[in-house]
Structure formats: C-alpha cells, structure tokens
UniProtKB/Swiss-Prot annotation:
Source species: Escherichia coli O6:H1 (strain CFT073 / ATCC 700928 / UPEC)
Modified residues (N6-(pyridoxal phosphate)lysine): K270
Organism lineage string: Bacteria, Pseudomonadati, Pseudomonadota, Gammaproteobacteria, Enterobacterales
Matches recorded under Pfam families: Beta_elim_lyase (PF01212)
Keywords: Acetylation, Lyase, Pyridoxal phosphate, Tryptophan catabolism
SUPFAM superfamilies: PLP-dependent transferases
Family: Belongs to the beta-eliminating lyase family.
Cross-referenced Gene3D superfamilies: Aspartate Aminotransferase, domain 1, Type I PLP-dependent aspartate aminotransferase-like (Major domain)
Record-given protein name: Tryptophanase
Record's catalysed reaction(s): L-tryptophan + H2O = indole + pyruvate + NH4(+)
UniProt subunit comment: Homotetramer.
Cofactor(s) required for function per UniProt: pyridoxal 5'-phosphate
Single GO molecular function: tryptophanase activity
C-alpha cells in the first residue's frame, strides 16, 4: 500500500450517530440567537462539528472494553493504580493525580507553584510573570485569576502563514531568558511548554528546543510544566522532522520528551482519546512537596486523589487510551487528514497556517482584510461558515486572547485564525471535501461579511460565553 496516493481511514466504523440537515434560514436564526458565538449553538443544529477535538472523537474498542474493569471504590481504587502505572511506563513520572479534564489540573497546580515560589524565593505577586511558547486559553485564564501575568515567547515564524518551518511551536529561547532576567527569576513561578502549540496552529516543538528551554529553567531553578494535550502528535512530528529521532518509536520519543519537564498537566480528551479526563503528574521526589499540596487541593476541587472526579471505568479507559493514542499508523492517518484539508483549502485560494496536528487554521485576516482585529474577523468567518454549511468552527485570535486584565485594553494578537478542529476517527475524506466546497461559497461572499461587536462580554475566558452582533 506504500504507492497509493490516499489511504482510507485505518479503522472500521461500527456505531454511527445520525445528524440532521438544516436550512440556511434556520441556521441564520440559530447563529443570531446564539449571539454570533458558535460555542452557544445547540449541537443538534450543527452538521459538521469542528469546534474542538477535545473529547469529541471516537474511542477504540480496547478503551471501551477497559471500562468494564472499573473499580468504583471511593479511595484506593485499583483503576487508579492502573492509570498511575500507565503514566510511569509512558512518561516516567512517579506521582499521578487524575482530574476531570485539563483545567482541573491547572486550577490545582498554578496556585501551588505560585505559593511555593513565594515561600522559597520571595516571589513578589505584584510582579510575577509566567512564560510559555504559547499558553492555552484556560492555562492563561487560571494564571490570570491567580494574579499572574502571562508572556508568550514564540519564534518569529510561528504565526506567519506564508512561511513553512518544521517546528513553529518552538520557544524563542533568547526571548525566554531575556524575559526571565527582565522580571527577575524569583518572580517567575513556572514555565509552561505547550505541545503541540495549539494557538500557533497545532505546531510542534522540537526536542532540541525543549532541551535548551529546560536547561534555562534549571539555571534559574524555575519549574517546567509540560502542557501535554497533544503529546503523541508532537512526538510524531519529531519522528518525521528531527533527523536524530527518525528511527525512534513514538513511545521512545515521548519518554525522552518528558525528561525536559518537572510536571505534566494534560487534557486527556485529545491525544489520549477519552471523552472526559485529565492528569496532573510529577516526575520524581524533588516535587513531592508540590504533589502533596496538589493532592490536598484535589480533595476540595476535584475529588479524592485516587479518582479526581473520574469514575473507575473512565480511569481504566484513560490508562488504555494513553497507549492507543501513540499508534503510529493512527497518527500518520490523522496528520494526513489535516494535510488533505489544508491542501484543498489552499488550492481554492484560502490561505492557511501550515498543517499542524489536529486542525486546519484558516488565516481569516487575509480572507477578510476589511474587518479590523477589534471586530474579530475570524469570529465573523466562523459565523458565515455556519450560515453557509452548518459547520461549526472556532476563532483563535483577538476574540480568544482577550484584554489585558490590568489595563482592560485588547491584547495584540499575532494572527486572526479560524480553527477547523478534526475530532478523532469521526469524519471521513468526504467530510473534508464538503468543508472545502463550503469555503468556496464563503469566499465568494467574503467582501460582504461584517465585523462584530460585543453585546455581552465576560471578564475571563470571554470567548466561551460572550454574545456579539454585527457592526
């Protein structure tokens, strides 16, 4: 099969979910009712749902079977120990706290690391800054509600949709060290390495870059947290693009990657393929004090530390999903599906970020140059795409980035992108062709698409629940 141009999906579809078709008039009414915010649409009114790949895909038969082994004991569940063993074997991390999803881990570890830095290094809360190659929205939100400013230090190629570069998710290493020196190392409670970099377009981070980042962190004794939602996709890109690792397995690359962090926080709803679940893990005894504090907070915020908001069956499913998500054939198919969509869009003149791991990112700023950033061109494009074809996508731009919590001013965004997120093992190549055709219709009417302004704006993570109207 090596000589075929396109290979079919490497799985058989056994269970299907019917979806309904709607009219243009129905969809126009629905998107207005939602406040021009696709997050607020009812899922039954969506024909193809590209909002997120978080918990929205299929699961494997081995994952589903594993649920039957679930031990629902409140404490000391054997399902917890099965999950902790998977974490040790895959990542090499000794201490595991399950959470209901990624933000459950964030709400625990962020205040603990801030407190630790304050007690041990004299951190000044009025001056503290955390760094990342690019913070995911909830990580940024949890940092900000704990009073911590966030700073993204990414390479110049990251958001340039006209440039092809193997590792657009990389840290700007000089910018990282310069920033640490500027704010003072003692005022940096943590560094977050996001793999892959979602906001940059699902772009990978190289192992070489992670190694240097970690050496900088160790120089200043700053803890590193690996934001691990798409750890397997990142490992696949390393295998494909970093020559030193071309003969390594995904498992070997993953184990090597996690040497260059002290903790991991994971939304397991992505590469671990579960509908619900997350992880917070510490590498070794040097972070046992953090583990102890996080366990205490887990009881209050998530549940007892041996279930963390998950039923026993869900922990068993996650223990298997961590392995299933690293299957090489599976990863090759998934990355190829995204590449197919990006290639098809660019063939019709729709500019995209280079294909990443989990989504096609359309450059809405270039498709809708008449709409200024403060009128959210990618959000306007999302609404038009829904009207035209019933496709739900998500804005990754100024609308998501939000305002500076200290000044209230809109934060400058490096690109206005529309993310077409592909759920795992859910849509076929025919769906990709339909999406491409939908963009032909959107492109024909692009000049008539209007910008948006707020009718309701939450102060934190506004993109989830805000309401807007056309200007």
């Amino acid at each position: 099969m090596e000589n075929f141009k396109h290979l079919p999906e490497p799985f058989r579809i056994r269970v299907i979910e019917p979806v309904k078709r709607t009219t243009r008039a129905y969809r126009e009414e629905a998107i207005i009712k939602s406040g021009m915010n696709p997050f607020l649409l009812d899922s039954e009114d969506v024909f193809i749902d590209l909002l997120t790949d978080s918990g929205t895909g299929a699961v494997t038969q081995s994952m589903q079977a594993a649920m039957m082994r679930g031990d629902e004991a409140y404490s000391g569940s054997r399902s917890y120990y099965a999950l902790a063993e998977s974490v040790k074997n895959i990542f090499g991390y000794q201490y595991t706290i399950p959470t209901h999803q990624g933000r459950g881990a964030e709400q625990i570890y962020i205040p603990v690391l801030i407190k630790k830095r304050e007690q041990e290094k004299g951190l000044d809360r009025s001056k503290m800054v955390a760094f990342s190659n690019y913070f995911f929205d909830t990580t940024q939100g949890h940092s900000q509600i704990n009073g911590c400013t966030v700073r993204n230090v990414y390479i110049k190629e990251a958001f340039d949709t006209g440039v092809r570069y193997d590792f657009k998710g990389n840290f700007d290493l000089e910018g990282l060290e310069r920033g640490i020196e500027e704010v003072g190392p003692n005022n940096v409670p943590y560094i977050v390495a996001t793999i892959t970099s979602n906001s940059a377009g699902g772009q990978p981070v190289s192992l070489a870059n992670l190694k240097v980042m970690y050496s900088i962190a160790k120089k200043y004794d700053i803890p590193v947290v690996m934001d691990s939602a798409r750890f397997a996709e990142n490992a696949y890109f390393i295998k494909q693009r970093e020559a030193e690792y071309k003969d390594w397995t995904i498992e070997q690359i993953t184990r090597e990657t996690y040497k260059y962090a002290d903790m991991l926080a994971m939304s397991a709803k992505k590469d671990a393929m579960v509908p619900m679940g997350g992880l917070l893990c510490m590498k070794d005894d040097s972070f046992f004090d953090v583990y102890t504090e996080c366990r205490t907070l887990c009881v209050v915020q998530e549940g007892f530390p041996t279930y963390g908001g998950l039923e026993g069956g869900a922990m068993e499913r996650l223990a298997v999903g961590l392995y299933d998500g690293m299957n090489l054939d599976w990863l090759a198919y998934r990355i190829a599906q995204v590449q197919y969509l990006v290639d098809g869009l660019e063939e019709i003149g729709v500019v995209c970020q280079q294909a990443g791991g989990h989504a096609a990112f359309v450059d809405a700023g270039k498709l809708l140059p008449h709409i200024p950033a403060d009128q959210f061109p990618a959000q306007a494009l999302a609404c038009e795409l829904y009207k035209v074809a019933g496709i739900r996508a998500v804005e990754i731009g100024s609308f998501l980035l939000g305002r500076d919590p200290k000044t209230g001013k809109q934060l400058p965004c490096p690109a206005e992108l529309l993310r077409l997120t592909i759920p795992r093992a859910t849509y076929t190549q025919t769906h990709m062709d339909f999406i491409i055709e939908a963009f032909k219709h959107v492109k024909e009417n692009a000049a008539n698409i209007k910008g948006l302004t707020f009718t309701y704006e939450p102060k934190v993570l506004r993109h989830f629940t805000a309401k807007l109207k056309e200007v």
